[in-house]
């Protein structure tokens, strides 16, 4: 397989056609090579329009979704990012090239170890990974966080039936959350922006169907 041709085709045929037109994002996909974050058994699928299996029953998102997320959160060099669901470390690596610092949470020890190896192999130092459950929010703090342990951008890599308030409280004024909200088969990729101390705006980006985060909060369906 001609890897560079496959990468070019992925960008031109999958990613551009999914409204990812930001040239900085497209250039970054050539710098951070996706195949380096794909398990060895699935490297031949690195550029396919599909989710790639990871250890522990998890998956990498489709390439077009990773790129669209990166474009829509529009991370700036001075910003701190919280990622829920480190996986293989690929999204963290992309975010690190844009951000001041990335804090990434992974519930599976095997995946955290995999991501740490991959990120270290790229010489990425502006990332801290933690072993923990971030599905209902992240109470941990790090020296990279802003005032009150808040973040400029939060990226949640699995789906949630509802967005816990804990994430909204972690968001700085002007900050953005990317989350996939809903239940299969009707899920929506959303950007939630903090407009003031009490006001948030939500933009629906696309419809999708992604595996939910383990231990995600489920709303009660009881009625009175």
Regions found by a protein language model. Give the residues of each.
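Class I SAM-dependent transferase core
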Residues: 1-82, 90-93, 98, 111-125, ...
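Conserved nucleotide-cofactor-binding alpha/beta core module
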Residues: 74-199
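Adenosine-phosphate binding glycine-rich loop
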Residues: 220
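Catalytic, metal-anchored helix/loop core of enzyme active sites in primary metabolism
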Residues: 224
């Amino acid at each position: 397989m001609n890897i560079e041709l496959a990468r070019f085709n992925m960008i031109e045929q999958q990613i551009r056609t999914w409204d990812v037109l930001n040239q900085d994002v497209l250039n970054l996909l050539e710098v951070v090579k996706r195949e380096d974050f794909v398990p060895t058994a699935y490297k031949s699928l690195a550029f396919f329009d599909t989710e790639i299996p990871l250890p522990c029953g998890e998956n990498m998102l489709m390439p077009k979704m990773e790129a669209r997320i990166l474009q829509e959160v529009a991370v700036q060099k001075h910003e701190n990012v919280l990622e829920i669901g480190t996986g293989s470390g690929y999204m963290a690596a992309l975010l690190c090239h844009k951000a001041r610092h990335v804090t990434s949470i992974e519930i599976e020890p095997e995946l955290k170890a995999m991501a740490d190896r991959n990120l270290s192999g790229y010489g990425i130092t502006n990332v801290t990974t933690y072993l923990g459950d971030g599905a209902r929010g992240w109470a941990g703090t790090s020296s990279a966080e802003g005032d009150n342990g808040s973040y400029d951008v939060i990226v949640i890599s699995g789906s949630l039936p509802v967005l816990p308030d804990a994430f909204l409280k972690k968001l700085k004024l002007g900050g953005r959350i990317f989350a996939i909200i809903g239940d299969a088969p009707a899920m929506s990729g959303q950007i939630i922006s903090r407009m003031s101390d009490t006001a948030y705006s939500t933009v629906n980006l696309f419809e999708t169907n992604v595996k939910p985060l383990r231990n995600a909060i489920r709303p009660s369906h009881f009625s009175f």
